[in-house]
Amino acid sequence: MQQFEWIHGAWLGLAIMLEIAANVLLKFSDGFRRKCYGILSLAAVLAAFSALSQAVKGIDLSVAYALWGGFGIAATLAAGWVLFGQRLNPKGWVGVILLLAGMVMIKFA
């Protein structure tokens, strides 16, 4: 396991925020009918992967990717709830809980 440095955690945090932004912008693009939002979404995805590539210099890939994906999904869920009024059914909440539990288990494995 690599030694954790805060700069790599910051890169991972930036990657997560950019992924969330990309997902929200993709929703705003309305299937790329609103091209400006679609292009911004693509740029945010590229920037997210660039930040993730910096994060994995100091964080194990399995841990970084699990945290990036898991927090990205959970935060996108929250953004969808706040911005678009989207709701999960009980099975969806079970999935989110399992996702978060899996992230914790990977981190401590």
UniProtKB/Swiss-Prot annotation:
Main location: membrane
GO CC annotation: plasma membrane
Keyword terms: Cell inner membrane, Cell membrane, Membrane, Transmembrane, Transmembrane helix, Transport
Molecular function via GO: amino-acid betaine transmembrane transporter activity; antiporter activity; choline transmembrane transporter activity; spermidine transmembrane transporter activity
GO biological process: choline transport; glycine betaine transport; spermidine transmembrane transport
Membrane topology qualifier: Multi-pass membrane protein
Entry annotated with the keyword Transport: yes
Disulfide bonds: none
Pfam families listed in its UniProt record: Multi_Drug_Res (PF00893)
Xref: InterPro entries: Small_drug/metabolite_transptr, Small_multidrug_res, Spermidine_export_MdtI
Bilayer-crossing regions: 6-26, 36-56, 64-84, 88-108
Keyword Repeat: no
Subcellular location field: Cell inner membrane
Subunit and partners: Forms a complex with MdtJ.
Family statement: Belongs to the drug/metabolite transporter (DMT) superfamily. Small multidrug resistance (SMR) (TC 2.A.7.1) family. MdtI subfamily.
Function summary: Catalyzes the excretion of spermidine.
NCBIfam families hit by this protein: PRK10650.1
Protein's name in the database: Spermidine export protein MdtI
Native organism taxonomy: Bacteria, Pseudomonadati, Pseudomonadota, Gammaproteobacteria, Enterobacterales
